C-alpha cells in the first residue's frame, strides 16, 4: 500500500490564507545561504535556509519543514511526515513529477533562467516562480485554493537555488 504525501495537516492553514496567491523571496547574505520569504506589504512570513548540496529547511509561522535529496528523489517533510515528494521525469533534470495529497503534478524548471512552472496533470497551473538575473530575488505565484501549491512553490524555489548553487560551485557543470 503506497502512502501519498499530504500537505493538509502539516502546512499552516493561516499561512496559505494570508498569502493571496503570491510571495517574494530575497537572498540574505552575500552568498545567499538564506532567503527571506515575504508576503503582502513586504511582511516576512518565513525563511528558507540552505544547508549542504541536498538539504535545506523552511521556517514559517512556527512551522519547520526540511527538504532532502536521496538519490534521484526529493522530499519535503515536517515532523517526520512527507508533505510532498518529487522525482525527475525520465532522465531529464529539468522535468519533475511532484506528488502531494494524492495528486500528481508536473513541473518544468530552468535554473539558469531562474524559472519554474508546476501544474496538475490536467493542465491547471499550481505554482510559477521567476527570479532575477542574479538569482537573489524571486517572485512566486501559486493557486491559493490548492493546498499543495504554496509548499510546491517553496519547493521549486529550493530546487532552483540549490541547483544554481551546485552548478556554480562545480564551475558551471551540472
Which residue ranges define each predicted feature?
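Helix-adjacent hinge/juxtasegments
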Residues: 71-100
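Beta-strand C-termini and the immediately following turn/loop, strongest in propeller blades
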Residues: 68, 87-88, 108-109
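Low-complexity or membrane-interfacial segments used for flexible interactions
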Residues: 2-45, 50-55, 91-174
Amino acid at each position: 500500500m503506497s502512502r501519498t504525501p499530504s500537505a493538509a495537516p502539516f502546512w499552516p492553514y493561516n499561512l496559505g490564507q494570508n498569502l493571496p496567491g503570491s510571495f517574494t523571496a530575497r537572498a540574505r547574505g552575500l552568498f545567499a545561504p538564506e532567503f527571506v520569504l515575504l508576503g503582502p506589504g513586504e511582511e516576512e512570513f518565513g525563511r528558507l535556509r540552505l544547508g549542504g548540496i541536498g538539504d535545506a529547511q523552511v521556517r514559517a509561522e512556527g512551522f519547520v519543514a526540511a527538504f532532502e535529496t536521496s538519490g534521484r528523489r526529493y522530499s519535503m517533510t515536517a515532523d517526520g511526515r512527507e508533505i510532498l515528494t518529487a522525482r525527475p521525469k525520465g532522465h531529464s533534470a529539468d522535468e519533475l513529477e511532484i506528488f502531494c495529497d494524492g495528486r500528481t503534478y508536473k513541473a518544468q524548471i530552468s535554473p539558469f533562467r531562474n524559472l519554474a512552472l508546476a501544474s496538475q496533470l490536467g493542465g491547471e497551473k499550481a505554482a510559477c516562480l521567476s527570479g532575477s538575473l542574479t538569482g537573489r530575488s524571486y517572485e512566486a505565484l501559486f493557486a491559493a485554493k490548492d493546498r499543495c501549491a504554496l509548499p510546491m512553490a517553496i519547493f521549486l524555489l529550493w530546487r532552483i537555488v540549490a541547483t544554481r548553487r551546485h552548478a556554480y560551485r562545480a564551475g558551471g557543470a551540472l
